């Protein structure tokens, strides 16, 4: 089966084409709505790239150009040849708890919760509708970042706010990066020869956005991100957990409105807010040059991450593995070493040589009580697999 995976942003479309779990091509349409828009497609077998630079007025034109480049490359003659299209959807809200085939009711529900994820859901809807128009016979599937976390118990996802905020406004913890946490937990169970339904793990998805997830018997029981991706860990430009009273204080002191506060917390905080850098390669290079703010930022990041991992020991009856994934998780041996050494008393015994050399696989010592693994995330592949399964079973 040929499955196209789409991730539609407000001004971009990321796409990847799979056949029987093998990636054939990937690409990006960017700067949609601007004069200097561009589209690039890469044939992942030959390595050949196909590019166009022109003004792309909207997502519909972007999808038409994707179709043209596929035909030009010979990888796919027409989008109607696809067996299915899987769409990454950031937020499913309280009602869309499972991945599903698209119909009118699903589109209405994604739109209904768009106010909870205003930066993502409206763009996802445009992507789905554009694809339906471009290839009307191809089934579309929605894969929700929030779905994996729907197994959390109510005492884990509820906030101690007036209950009516939950009833009337759906204010609760939803969690994100679910597709990634689901994929790497299954991969880790396979690597360790465990049945996923009996596998307990803590998964750390560490990129510019970062979250941890407590997994019991293959299901999420808690995660660090909340109502939005702002809660939890210190991130590249996001503050993570803070005392909520800081916000009205700053609003009053600095005459800031809600939009100012939102921008400050999401785009000007995190490690960037502390040291002026959000790329950990730059932060670690600055530490080599004795930049104290860079050292502080790294220490804060690793401390918060260690605290979250440690707290999940309190809610899991047993921990089989700690999984590192995403850009920092897969590539930053300094972060992994600092966290695992801080948590050594809990049963983590990291092999520093393996940690420095490997970017995939087990990095704990043979006699480590808890296994430590690097598992590269493949969110698009997971979306393609889910899409294939739903179409086969429809």
From Swiss-Prot:
Molecular-function annotations in GO: acetate kinase activity; ATP binding; magnesium ion binding
Q: Which Gene3D superfamilies match?
A: 3.30.420.40
Tell me if ATP-binding is a UniProt keyword of this record. yes
GO BP: acetate metabolic process; acetyl-CoA biosynthetic process
Q: Which PROSITE patterns match?
A: ACETATE_KINASE_1 (PS01075), ACETATE_KINASE_2 (PS01076)
The reaction(s) catalysed by this protein are: acetate + ATP = acetyl phosphate + ADP
Q: Which cofactor does it need?
A: Mg(2+); Mn(2+)
Q: What does this protein do?
A: Catalyzes the formation of acetyl phosphate from acetate and ATP. Can also catalyze the reverse reaction.
- Residues recorded as binding ATP, renumbered to this chain, are 14, 205-209, 279-281, 327-331
Question: Where is substrate annotated to bind?
Answer: 88
Q: Which CDD domains match?
A: ASKHA_NBD_AcK_PK (cd24010)
Give the protein's recorded name. Acetate kinase
Localisation per UniProt entry: Cytoplasm
**Which residues are listed under the site Transition state stabilizer?**
177, 238
The UniProt entry, under PANTHER family, shows: ACETATE KINASE, ACETATE KINASE-RELATED
**Broad enzyme group:** transferase
Q: What positions does the entry give for Mg(2+) binding?
A: 7, 379
Listed pathway(s): Metabolic intermediate biosynthesis; acetyl-CoA biosynthesis; acetyl-CoA from acetate: step 1/2
Q: Which EC number applies?
A: 2.7.2.1
Domain of life assignment: Bacteria
A Pfam family it matches: Acetate_kinase
The UniProt note on the cofactor reads as follows:
Mg(2+). Can also accept Mn(2+).
Q: Name one GO cellular component term.
A: cytoplasm
The record's section on InterPro entries has: Ac/propionate_kinase, Aliphatic_acid_kin_short-chain, Aliphatic_acid_kinase_CS, ATPase_NBD
Keywords in UniProt for this one?
A: ATP-binding, Cytoplasm, Kinase, Magnesium, Metal-binding, Nucleotide-binding, Transferase
Q: What binding partners and quaternary form does the record give?
A: Homodimer.
């Amino acid at each position: 089966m040929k499955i196209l995976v789409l991730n539609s942003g407000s001004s971009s479309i990321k796409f990847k084409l799979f056949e029987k779990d093998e990636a054939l091509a990937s690409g990006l349409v960017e700067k949609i709505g601007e004069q200097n828009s561009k589209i690039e497609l890469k044939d992942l077998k030959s390595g050949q790239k196909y590019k166009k630079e022109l003004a792309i007025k909207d997502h519909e034109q972007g999808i038409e150009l994707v179709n043209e480049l596929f035909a030009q490359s010979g990888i796919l003659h027409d989008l109607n040849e696809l067996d299915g299209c899987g769409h990454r959807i950031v937020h499913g809200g309280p009602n869309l708890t499972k991945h599903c085939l698209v119909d009118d009711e699903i589109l209405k529900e994604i739109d209904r919760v768009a106010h909870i994820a205003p930066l993502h859901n409206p763009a996802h809807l445009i992507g789905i509708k554009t694809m339906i128009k471009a290839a009307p016979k191809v089934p579309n599937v929605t894969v929700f970042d929030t779905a994996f976390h729907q197994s959390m118990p109510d005492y884990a996802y509820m906030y101690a706010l007036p209950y009516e905020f939950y009833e009337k406004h759906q204010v609760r913890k939803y969690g994100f990066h679910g597709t990634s946490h689901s994929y790497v937990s299954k991969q880790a169970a396979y690597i360790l020869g465990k049945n996923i339904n009996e596998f307990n793990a803590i998964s750390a998805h560490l990129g510019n956005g970062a979250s941890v997830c407590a997994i019991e018997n293959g299901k999420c029981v808690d995660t660090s991100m909340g109502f939005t991706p702002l809660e939890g860990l210190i991130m590249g430009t996001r503050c993570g957990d803070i005392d909520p009273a800081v916000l009205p204080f700053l609003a009053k002191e600095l005459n800031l409105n809600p939009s100012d506060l939102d921008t400050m917390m999401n785009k000007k905080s995190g490690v960037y807010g502390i040291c002026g850098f959000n790329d950990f390669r730059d932060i670690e290079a600055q530490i080599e040059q004795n930049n104290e703010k860079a050292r502080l930022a790294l220490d804060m990041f690793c401390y918060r991450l260690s605290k979250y991992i440690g707290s999940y020991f309190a809610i899991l009856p047993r921990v089989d593995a700690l999984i590192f994934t995403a850009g920092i998780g897969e590539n930053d041996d300094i972060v992994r070493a600092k966290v695992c050494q801080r948590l050594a008393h809990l049963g983590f015994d990291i092999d520093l040589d393996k940690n420095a050399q490997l970017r995939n696989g087990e990095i704990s010592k043979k006699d480590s009580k808890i296994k430590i693994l690097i598992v590269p995330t493949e969110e698009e592949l997971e979306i393609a697999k889910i899409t294939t399964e739903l179409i086969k079973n429809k």
